[in-house]
Amino acid sequence: LLFTPSYQNGVIKELVTEVPRDDFDVEKEGQVEIIGWLYQYYNEEPHDQVVNINGGPVKTDDIPAATQLFTTDWVVRYMVDNSLGKKYLEHYPDSPVKGKLKYLLPGDITPDQSDFDITRIQVMDNAMGSGHILAYAFDVLMTMYEDQGYAKREAANSIIQNNLFGLEIDRRAFQLSYFSLMMKLRRYDRQALNRSVMPNIHVFIAAPAVTEEFLHSLKASSEVIDEIQDIAAHFMDAKTLGSIIELPANYDYAGMRNALEPVATAQKISLFGNQQTAQQLLEIIATAETMTQRYDVVVTNPPYLNKMNSTLKKYVKKHYKDYSADLFSVFIWHNINMTKVNGYAGYMTPFVWMFIKSYEKLRTALLSNVKIDSLIQLEYSAFEEATVPINTFVLKNTKNDETGTYLRLSDFKGGMMIQAEKVQEAIADPGVKYLYRTNQT
């Protein structure tokens, strides 16, 4: 079991007293909400223990407990509606899809006359947790496929196989994401679990030791052998570094797979564990290939962590020096570079990056290279689970001085439900005093 059943304390008590009733309603897509809340409450005690240990660096095994927070539903909808939703409306501005994007903020939509194929729109969450963002993106994509004339069963299978991608360092969270997406698919295709349809999501594993004996078992060129050794070196600390690992753009993934697959599937068992090593390396290659793609939309609630252990701190200082104040700021910059030109990146992060000197280089880089398409500054204590003041925002990977949309909710106390109500009021009446339309300079 994930937890000890108890109605007096622990997970069940939290579910009964803290989770909105609608989140239990399967007809209202409540099953995904419940998976997320279950995992957050399951992690609540270890999270509190980890973040309060003498104020010291967080160990690799404790990073998931220290950094995982379930993203509030309306924030997920805001991020996806204003990134994936907006991407679609750039091609189809008069589509009825617009009316289904409940959290689409008022703002300009730049027409895009280029060819559009819904099966080629790719959405990434590279800190996916229990899959809340990807699950909602699935729903939005379903409305788009239907708008394009697809049958629901065909659309659902295409979404799982072509549109959604995810990365995660914690295996249990990965398993919940996998389950959530497969349940989404099964809703439209009852036979889905009987076929080999699999979501494009991956969990990070540390690279196995690549011995000389193992390398001798491979039938491959010296160039491919070198690449296998190189990718293994990059993933040595994958359980610590996860999605921020920087990889070469020109790996010969097909060549590496061709070298490893015969060993991974060999009938004769190797005394040296070569099959297992090859299988693990194939898993790493699939993860790496996902990491080195660029996406139309990247949306995530990144980890918030400034108490980095020595391995993470050294890597961040080397590869992300200007953004190293906190792990969330590393993700802000990293994810922009994961996004295609004119693509969108959505985030929920602490709002200190907008004000504090240690994030000045991040602010300068963003203002010089991307457009802040929209931003919502939440009331200081609205998101209690994060223990820090939060904002949520969407960046567009383009240099321009077009007008963005900003909501300042700092005057509205009462938690996340009040914040959601104020967002809805601003969407219904863009003339409210806390909505601003301005460029970022």
How does the language model describe each region?
Residues 296, 300-305, 351:
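Amphipathic alpha-helical repeat scaffolds
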Residues 16-26, 56-74, 118-128, 157-167, ...:
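Glycine- and acidic
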Residues 1-159, 173, 302-306, 331, ...:
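Class I S-adenosyl-L-methionine
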Residues 79, 167-175, 183, 323-377, ...:
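Conserved Class I SAM-dependent methyltransferase catalytic core
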Residues 155-162, 169, 176, 198-206:
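Extended charged low-complexity segments that act as oligomerization/scaffolding linkers
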Residues 180, 191, 195-295, 368-373, ...:
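Polynucleotide-recognition surfaces of large bacterial nucleic-acid defense/processing enzymes
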Residues 101-122, 267-299, 311-319, 329, ...:
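Flexible, glycine/threonine-enriched loop-and-boundary segments that flank and lead into catalytic domains
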